């Protein structure tokens, strides 16, 4: 579905939300969901009248299998360049293991991951904080993983991966305790995001936060009062 002009959330993708941006200097994809989503994503691109061979980048907000699962499949089909933050690059390329999630969900991930059919891929582009790619700025937001990022256009849009949650009605929520490698760092990252200005927040899971999204995030943080318990640190 088209969320706003030239920004699509691809319907039916298993796993994390998968976004396609068709405007700007290059067409690009943000995250791919679980393994075996490749044909579904390609068919969506064709259905909206775009050519999959015009896909220039597949940008990973971080390295969990529900975000990177179909990267290798899509790279083979499209030859798009794969981009991920330097801290998560080893996981994508198979040189390091997926992050450890706490609790029963973590055990399920550990047992199921070998059966999911993930194929490692060496990234073409290593992302760093404040880099520009495809008309967006990379914002380093560690905590969920060590290499989590957001993609940001000032005053317009932010793709935030799993830096925070969103419910089915598009209300922002705090990061998951069990799914964050470092919850304190994750909270710092959300505070940093709240200092940016954007109208739409596009999460890795949940519904888009539309219309004054940065103000809604500030309102959420005002209730939580994290600034009092978590001192800011440089990323």
Task: Give residue spans per PLM region.
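A structural micro-motif
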Residues: 5, 80-81, 136, 199
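Active-site HxH/HxHxD metal-binding segment of metal-dependent hydrolases
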Residues: 36-38, 46-125, 222, 226-227
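Metallo-beta-lactamase
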Residues: 35-36, 139-140, 146-224, 229-231
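Conserved beta-strand hairpin/beta-sheet module of binuclear metal-dependent hydrolase folds
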Residues: 1-48, 150-161, 166
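Short, flexible loop segments at the rims of nucleotide/cofactor-binding pockets, characterized by
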Residues: 6-10, 35, 58-61, 135-141, ...
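Core dinuclear metal-dependent hydrolase active-site scaffold
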Residues: 20, 126-153
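Glycine-rich phosphate-binding loop signature in dinucleotide/nucleotide-binding domains
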Residues: 48-53, 131-134, 195-196
